[in-house]
Design a protein with these regions (language model features):
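Aromatic, loop-rich ligand-recognition surfaces of beta-strand-rich domains
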Residues: 460-462, 466-497, 586-668, 674-718
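Beta1/beta-strand and adjacent pyrophosphate-binding region of the FAD-binding site
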Residues: 2-14
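N-terminal Rossmann-fold NAD(P) dinucleotide-binding loop
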Residues: 17
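Exposed low-complexity, polar/acidic, P/S/T/G-rich flexible segments that act as propeptides
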Residues: 536-586, 702-718
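Extracellular carbohydrate recognition and processing domains
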Residues: 498-522, 667-684
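Short, well-structured beta-strand segments enriched in hydrophobic/aromatic residues
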Residues: 153, 471-473, 516-551, 696
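Conserved N-terminal/central alpha/beta ligand/cofactor-binding core
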Residues: 5, 23, 29-30, 34-112, ...
Length: 718
């Protein structure tokens, strides 16, 4: 037997476990990450190949998940722009194995735990192939297994469906979300025969459910298009996992046989390139934690004093009968971004065990939203920060004082977690009391249209309410017409949940181009205004040559957003001082500095007295309204409402330098080239004493301007 002693043991190597382990190690803890598979990534790995999705995929603008998960996704976009699942595995493995203070145990299945007075002492598992048994002793543990297996073995009560179970209780039959196996297809330049295995379902069995509830197959569907190949929701998704996997294999091979050999498809040259051997599991245990997130919390966006991360995926219900159901293959209720409290990550009676991933504490109606992998990754980062706080102050999570919880939240905010409504209050951040100036500031200008966006099917413009609550926009009409719209107000816009209605506005159009006034309602003050247009055949909205950050247009049914020629009234949207206003993302306002187009825009922080620092944190603009999935196929069905990125975000800073005004004059103290990160940490290499600091944007990935949400300056950051 091999034994390890550590600060934190994380069990489970999916997005939640990987993010938990990386965050904890970044915060200075010694960490052991235990994964029962040969690769990291869980359902997003090359073994299962479900793509990671979250708030943006469900229609929320400016809400792509960042933090630790965001850094991994950005690295994947940089090194693996085609979204190949194998390379996503390596992005995760590279991050984990290169992180100081982090030990990785692959192929190690934890089957035993030791508990004393409800405190975990160790977890133990066998490692495949090495014939080793590992026992890991830790001060804190995070169960990121998905199934909540560590918590269940430790005696933590848990939920399955609507039923609460305690240790050793036999689960009752219940209706759950099923599991799925995916496949990838490939088109060859010659016919490829397919002879089905004997276990595959017959053509007649496969044909029976097709066409019901949106279950339509084609020869081109591939990867996550196959999500509705679903089974197991009426079985025990843990105890019957192997039977479920084989049944899914029968279904998948039967469907492919139907595509190849029924004569209904142009599939002669198509073949299977890959078939999953492991199902992607959607639902099993949910732990009974100090607080259970509810449907009401999701729909009403409850403001929690201990909010630790956020969600934004649909309330996404699937019939338990899966592919055999007569119901729609899913019912998706869109929601706005909502907070999840840290109390969902622990049971008050178990002082050193935390949870992350789909096994956190929620009511089932909330679980169908929190279960997706982007949200799971954020929960892992939050659990790691909570573990760090517990070890720092020597307390259980339930015993933390309000000011200690707030310190954990501020730490998460610094580590690029978006906590809706929370602003930077870090007393160690020297940038907060600096005066800020810049070389320039961007102002949208009136000009000719760079293109046109049809309003035939309606559409929207999302813009934060300016200080002068009005704006101007250009439309073109083929003939005289009436254009009508409804105003909505919200802190963060969504194409599917535009917010509270706040009045109507209409315009009489003449044939040709018309400049129109948009009058923001009083309810929009301090919020976003969403101007939602009724369908207007023959009317188009003018598009701008350059994006005005924080202002977008689009349609409710489409994930592609455009840049309207919309001129807001007097505002401070892109002012230099926004970089120290405490917000590093869009929330009610853009909260960023955007320069005018120029060769080397700069931003300067200046203090009344000299300050000593060694670290500068820059929170950059990676285009937060576009998804960065872990992987994707060359083809995806329209119902996913997914828009693929074409390369790196043009507004992201690529090359940047930092200069300091010391007693000997200006000198460069830090520089980065080829940046791909959203949170860019620059080290001066030594303590620098200066009265001013200047950031110079040398190059972006395409934009002529500089985009910057926030600057932080620290002495001895870590």
């Amino acid at each position: 037997m091999k034994e390890l002693y550590t600060d934190l043991a994380v069990v489970g190597g999916g997005p939640a476990g990987v993010c938990a382990a990386l965050e904890a190690a970044r915060l200075g803890l010694e960490v052991v990450l235990i994964q029962n598979r040969p690769v990291l990534g869980g359902s997003s790995s090359s073994e299962i190949r479900v793509w990671t999705r979250g708030a943006v995929g469900a229609g929320n603008l400016f809400s792509e998940e960042m933090g630790v998960l965001g850094a991994l996704k950005k690295r994947n976009l940089y090194t693996n722009p085609d979204g190949t699942p194998l390379f996503w595995d390596d992005v995760l493995l590279d991050a984990v194995t290169s992180q100081p203070g982090l030990t990785l145990l692959l192929n190690t299945d934890v089957t035993e735990v030791e508990v004393q007075d409800r405190r975990l002492l160790w977890v133990q598992g066998s490692q495949q192939a090495s014939e080793r048994t590992w026992r890991v002793h830790a001060k804190m543990f995070i169960d990121a297994t998905g199934d909540g297996s560590v918590g269940a073995r430790a005696g933590v009560p848990y939920w399955i469906g609507e039923h609460l179970f305690r240790k050793d209780a036999a689960p009752e039959p219940t209706a759950l979300l099923g599991s799925s196996i995916l496949y990838y297809v490939k088109k060859e330049d010659h016919p490829v025969a397919f002879v089905p295995p004997s276990y595959a379902y017959s053509l007649e069995d496969v044909e029976a459910p097709l066409g019901r509830g949106g279950r339509i197959v084609s020869e081109t569907q591939s990867g996550s298009d196959c999500w509705w190949f679903e089974y197991g929701g009426l079985r025990n998704t843990i105890a019957d996992a192997q039977d479920i996997a084989f049944e899914l294999r029968r279904i998948v091979m039967g469907i492919w046989n139907y595509i190849k050999n029924s004569g209904r498809f142009n599939a002669a040259c198509y073949t299977l390139e890959w078939v999953g051997s492991l199902p992607g599991k959607r639902e099993s245990r949910r732990m009974d934690t100090a607080y259970l997130l509810s449907q009401e919390d999701v729909l009403r966006h409850t403001d929690f004093a201990d909010g630790g991360f956020y969600g934004g995926w649909y309330m996404d219900f699937h019939p338990a009968e899966g592919i055999g159901s007569d119901e729609d293959n899913c019912t998706q209720i869109p929601v706005n971004v909502y907070a999840v409290p840290l109390r969902c990550l622990y049971h008050a009676d178990f002082p050193n065990l935390l949870f992350a991933g789909r096994n956190i504490g929620t009511r089932r109606e909330a679980f169908v939203s929190t279960r997706v992998m982007n949200t799971c990754g954020l929960s892992g980062q939050a659990a790691a920060a909570l573990a760090w706080g517990c070890l720092r102050w020597g307390k259980s999570p339930a015993a933390l004082a309000p000011e200690e919880v707030e310190r954990i939240r501020q730490t998460l905010l610094r580590e690029d977690m978006f906590l809706p409504g929370l602003s930077n209050q870090d007393p160690e951040d020297l940038a907060r009391d600096a005066a800020v100036t810049a070389s320039s500031r961007y102002q949208p200008e009136e000009g000719p249209a760079a293109g046109w966006f049809s309003l035939e099917q309606g559409g929207f413009v999302a813009c934060p309410c300016p200080d002068e609550p009005r704006g101007r926009f250009l439309v073109r009409a083929d003939a005289p017409a009436t254009l009508q719209a409804v105003w909505h107000c919200c802190p963060l816009p969504s194409r599917l949940c535009p917010g509270q209605p706040a009045g109507k506005q209409s315009w009489q159009l003449t044939a040709g181009e018309n400049w129109l006034d948009a009058l923001f309602p009083s309810q929009a003050q301090g919020q976003y205004g969403m101007l939602v247009f009724d369908p207007a055949p023959g009317v188009s909205l003018a598009l701008a040559e350059r994006r005005a950050p924080g202002i977008l247009c689009g349609r409710a049914d489409a994930p592609e957003y455009r840049d309207p020629l919309f001129l807001p009234g007097k505002n401070s949207f892109y002012a230099p001082e926004n970089v120290v206003d405490g917000c590093s993302r869009v929330w009610r306002q853009p909260h960023l500095w955007c320069s005018a187009p120029e060769a080397a825009p700069w931003l300067e922080l200046r203090w009344d007295t000299p300050r000593t620092f060694d670290t500068i944190l820059l929170y950059l603009d990676p285009e937060l309204s576009m998804e960065i999935p872990s992987s994707r196929t060359d083809h995806w069905e329209d119902h996913h409402r997914f828009a693929a990125r074409k390369g790196m975000p043009p507004q992201l800073m690529r090359d940047v330098s930092v200069q300091a005004l010391t007693e000997n004059g200006w000198r460069t103290v830090a520089r980065c080239t080829g940046n791909w990160r959203r949170l860019l940490e620059l080290s001066a290499g030594e303590a620098v004493t200066a009265t001013a600091l200047r950031l110079v944007r040398e190059k972006t990935w395409g934009d002529e301007r500089a985009h910057l949400f926030e600057v932080r300056v620290y002495r001895q950051h870590r």
